[in-house]
């Protein structure tokens, strides 16, 4: 899961 809150990418899985 990566909503972009700790990374510059937003996947929203």
Swiss-Prot record:
Keywords annotated in UniProt: Hormone, Neuropeptide, Secreted
Localization of this protein: Secreted
GO molecular function: hormone activity
GO cellular component: extracellular region
One Gene Ontology biological process: neuropeptide signaling pathway
Tissue: Brain. Appears to be mainly expressed in two pairs of bilaterally symmetrical cells in the protocerebrum.
Purpose of the protein: Inhibitor of fluid secretion by Malpighian tubules. Uses cGMP as second messenger. May function as an antidiuretic hormone.
Descriptive protein name: Antidiuretic factor B
Organism: Tenebrio molitor (Yellow mealworm beetle)
Organism classification: Eukaryota, Metazoa, Ecdysozoa, Arthropoda, Hexapoda
């Amino acid at each position: 899961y990566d909503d972009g809150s700790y990374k510059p990418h937003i996947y929203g899985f």
